[in-house]
C-alpha cells in the first residue's frame, strides 16, 4: 500500500509499505477514505521532533471503511463506515473507566496516539472501545459533511474535552485563549454546553 513516510525534518515521501494486518483479537484494519494533517504533525515535519529517519508518519486523524476484524471484535463489521480517533485506550483500565482513555494504562506504546494514519490502510487497536461507527457510507454524505465528521477524530473532540473539563454550563461566560482549530472547536463546544457569552482571544484580527 502507499503511505506517507517521514524521511527527515522538512521532507516527507509517499512510498510503498506493507499493508497492516490483524495482530490482536480486538484489532481492525481500516481502508482510509479521508485523513488530514494536524498542527502537531507539523512539529515533527519542521523540527524532526526526535523522530527516526525514514519512519512512520505522525498522522492520527482519519475515517474509513472497516476491511477486516479480529475474532473478538463485536462493535463493527467489515463494510462499516467508521471514524478512528487519534487517542484511545483499552476500555478496561482505571483511567479508561474514569473517562480518561487518553491516559490509558495498557496502551502498548509510550503514547497512545495512533500514528501512521496518512496511509491507504491502518490497523486500529481496541476497536470495541474506541471506534466511532457512522451511519451509512461515505457516498451518503456531502464533502462538507465528511470534513465535519473528520474533525471528530481529534480537533473537535479535543475542543469539547476542554469545555467539559472546564465544566462549562448554561449561562457561563467563557474565554478561550488561542484561535487555532482546537480553540475554534472549543468555542463551538462551549456554545453547545450553553455558555451565554464566549470571548476568543488571539493575535489574528481576521478570526
Where are these regions (language model features)?
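Cytochrome P450 core scaffold surrounding the K-helix E-X-X-R motif
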Residues: 40-46
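Conserved S-adenosyl-L-methionine
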Residues: 192-197
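Glycine-rich beta-strand-centered segment in the early N-terminal region that forms part
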Residues: 18-35, 48-96, 115, 135-142
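Hydrophobic/small residue at the entry helix of a nucleotide-binding pocket
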Residues: 158, 182, 206
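NAD(P)H dinucleotide-binding glycine-rich loop of Rossmann-like/cofactor-binding domains
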Residues: 90-177
Amino acid at each position: 500500500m502507499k503511505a506517507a513516510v517521514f524521511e527527515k525534518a522538512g521532507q516527507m515521501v509517499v512510498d510503498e509499505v506493507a499493508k497492516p494486518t490483524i495482530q490482536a483479537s480486538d484489532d481492525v484494519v481500516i481502508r482510509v477514505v479521508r485523513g488530514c494533517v494536524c498542527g502537531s504533525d507539523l512539529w515533527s515535519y519542521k523540527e524532526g521532533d526526535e523522530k527516526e529517519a525514514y519512519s512512520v508518519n505522525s498522522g492520527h486523524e482519519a475515517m474509513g471503511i472497516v476491511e477486516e476484524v479480529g475474532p473478538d471484535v463485536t462493535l463493527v463489521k467489515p463494510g462499516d463506515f467508521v471514524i478512528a480517533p487519534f487517542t484511545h485506550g483499552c476500555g478496561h483500565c482505571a483511567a479508561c473507566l474514569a473517562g480518561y482513555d487518553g491516559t490509558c494504562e495498557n496502551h502498548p506504546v509510550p503514547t497512545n496516539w495512533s500514528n501512521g494514519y496518512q496511509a491507504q490502510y491502518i490497523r486500529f487497536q481496541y476497536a470495541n472501545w474506541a471506534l466511532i461507527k457512522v451511519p451509512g457510507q461515505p457516498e451518503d454524505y456531502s464533502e462538507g459533511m465528511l470534513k465535519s465528521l473528520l474533525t471528530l477524530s481529534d480537533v473537535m473532540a479535543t475542543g469539547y474535552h476542554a469545555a467539559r473539563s472546564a465544566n462549562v454550563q448554561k449561562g457561563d461566560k467563557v474565554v478561550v485563549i488561542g484561535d487555532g482549530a482546537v480553540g475554534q472547536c472549543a468555542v463551538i463546544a462551549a456554545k453547545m454546553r450553553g455558555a451565554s457569552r464566549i470571548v476568543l482571544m488571539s493575535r489574528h484580527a481576521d478570526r
